[in-house]
């Protein structure tokens, strides 16, 4: 699927898809162009792949894929974001599991990135510390897999067509159509699997604003699912599966308490308001051991997937921006729209994003005043 990405971004994915090690008579490649661009249609014709453009654009990416499913007749569907370049071995590594397990509806592989995200670029940590998404595509998805609760992540996955048709195609009710789709598959009694071997590589978000915009969509979408199709209720899920889904949803609500902790000292410094009625020594005796224990425990469990110090940076930067939309989604899950993540951009020179930086500058100034 593609919407507004440059043709050069899509070309790499198509060329790599043509080179996948699989019988050519069983491999059908489609460009799903929601932008309806003539250059894309011409390119598809030149390289021998199929092309679909919609006349209407409802339900964004999910609607684009569902429209293509009307024409694609294969028993299995593999989906790649337009910037995710698959390896030659992708189908060889994933398809065998479907033959072994007839109830397997979806096989997910990691999202691996060959370019630095804004944190890695700005802090000079590319390939030196774990990527922000490494924790999810490492420990979290491995744990989900153990409890048969692997999430569909929208790309780099294979889905069996029959179960997908049974649930009406890709879910369109929320902006995280991928996780919602896997939830529906699990409710129908189908299984899923995760293979922690990268079989595709894509482009990380180039700018901090694009990165934050993507996380806002994920956060809002997971809270929408919690409100509209709560995994704690309804039929079809095992207890462990319910916990796995709720854990992912509650993670995105962490922005609210983090903002409270960031601003609580200022309430005392500026307004002399006591958040906790206790002497400073008693607070330190209770809080510091907990903080040290939590940090050491997380470091022990997460190991090479997420470092505690960098985790605080990731979560603090995002907290300002995911707290409002998640709160709104809790109150009104139908509010908001799907935001496309920009791909294929190139940051040619360093600059300060004053708009994104505004909350942090404001907090620093308040602390100085305090």
Regions of interest found by a model, annotated:
Residues 1-5, 20, 97:
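A conserved hydrophobic helix/loop-capping motif in glycosyltransferases and polysaccharide synthases
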Residues 1-15:
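Membrane-proximal cytosolic interface modules of multi-pass membrane proteins
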Residues 14-26:
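Short, acidic, metal-binding catalytic loop of nucleotide-sugar glycosyltransferases
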Residues 33-40, 56-57:
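A conserved acidic beta->alpha catalytic loop
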Residues 52-76, 88-175, 186-187, 204, ...:
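Long helical/loop segments within the catalytic core of UDP-sugar-dependent glycosyltransferases
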Residues 173, 182-200, 288:
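Catalytic donor-sugar/metal-binding loop of nucleotide-sugar-dependent glycosyltransferases
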Residues 251-336, 352-370:
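Membrane-embedded multi-pass helical conduit in multi-pass membrane proteins
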């Amino acid at each position: 699927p593609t919407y507004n990405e440059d043709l050069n971004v899509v070309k790499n994915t198509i060329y790599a898809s043509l080179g996948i090690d699989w019988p050519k008579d069983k491999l059908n490649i489609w460009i799903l162009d929601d932008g309806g661009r003539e250059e894309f249609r011409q390119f598809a014709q030149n390289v021998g792949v199929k092309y679909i453009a919609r006349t209407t654009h409802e339900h964004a990416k999910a609607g684009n894929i569902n429209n293509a499913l009307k024409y694609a007749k294969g028993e299995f569907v593999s989906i790649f974001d337009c910037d995710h370049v698959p390896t030659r071995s992708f189908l060889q590594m994933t398809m065998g599991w479907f033959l072994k397990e007839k109830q397997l509806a979806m096989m997910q592989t990691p999202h691996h990135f060959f370019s630095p995200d804004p944190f890695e670029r700005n802090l000079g940590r590319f390939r030196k510390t774990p990527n922000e998404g490494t924790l999810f595509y490492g420990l979290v998805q491995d744990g989900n897999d153990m409890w048969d609760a692997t999430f569909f992540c929208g790309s780099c996955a294979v889905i069996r067509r029959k179960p997908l048709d049974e649930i009406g195609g890709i879910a369109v009710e929320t902006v995280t159509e991928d996780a919602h789709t896997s939830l529906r598959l699990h409710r129908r009694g189908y299984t899923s699997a995760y293979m922690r071997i990268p079989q595709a590589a894509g482009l990380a978000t180039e700018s901090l604003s694009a990165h934050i915009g993507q996380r806002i969509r994920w956060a809002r979408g997971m809270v929408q699912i919690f409100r509209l199709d709560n995994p704690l209720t309804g039929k079809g899920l095992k207890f462990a599966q319910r916990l796995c889904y709720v854990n992912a949803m509650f993670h995105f609500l962490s922005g609210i308490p983090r903002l409270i902790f960031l601003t609580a000292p200022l309430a005392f410094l500026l307004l002399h308001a006591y958040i906790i009625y206790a002497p400073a020594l008693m607070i330190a005796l209770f809080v510091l051991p907990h903080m040290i224990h939590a940090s050491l425990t997380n470091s022990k469990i997460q190991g090479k997937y997420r470092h505690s110090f960098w985790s605080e940076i990731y979560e603090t930067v995002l907290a300002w921006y995911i707290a409002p939309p998640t709160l709104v989604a809790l109150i009104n899950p139908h509010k908001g729209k799907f935001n496309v993540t920009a791909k294929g951009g190139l940051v040619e020179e360093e600059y300060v994003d004053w708009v994104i930086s505004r909350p942090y500058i404001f907090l620093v100034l308040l602390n100085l005043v305090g």
